[in-house]
Amino acid sequence: MHRSSVLLGLCSAALAAAQGFSTECSDISIIDYWLVATCPTGSGDSITSSVFLNAKLANSNGNLGWAEDGYYARSCQDCTLDGATLSCECEIASLPSYQSTSLNLEEHIANYEGHLLSNQTGAITTIPSDSTVAVPSDFDVTLALATTGTACERTGVSLGLNNPTDCYYINLGVTIEYTAALQTDNQGWEIVAYADTECTSDPIYTFSSDDNDSCVVFNETVQAFSATPLWNADY
């Protein structure tokens, strides 16, 4: 389980009272497989935060269930949220190929002093500090990548990211090296470019929202990228 920002230690007893989110939080929605809500902190203000459901849920032959890195979005569609109940059409092994399934997200997701957090791997004993980066209204970000030269007008590869990832590269069976990139629509990701496909090199460049619509020329060729949310996120 990952949580953004610096963690602040709290005693488990102080967090035990969290019961859910649907009755006390507002502006609850599902955006690109992220659960987003604005929740009271208990101190008179509120925090907008998110949980990446694709890393929390799985489809088991047409039934939604809890699973770390379950990637339910690969085989479920037409998902809707009613209160805390997520309903989807998910693939099954026999005909018809999809069936309706629902899951109560409050089984493992609750408001902890303003933050939506999942407790499916254990009791919550720490919560993150509040990020200054707003939760995006659109989680998709695009990198148009050039493989030769330094002109972003000649990009030949388009990489779309909307999932947190420690390391990602386009695997076509041959090594692809990028010389420049044009980023668009980054509303809060930290995207780090690396010289190798394992993302073990020193960072070559770190993209933020400030780099939108600007051509970035790498000082050495790049092969892979990591993507980390900078907003309030449990992923």
Region spans (language model):
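Short, ordered beta-strand-loop transition motifs
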Residues: 28-34, 78-85
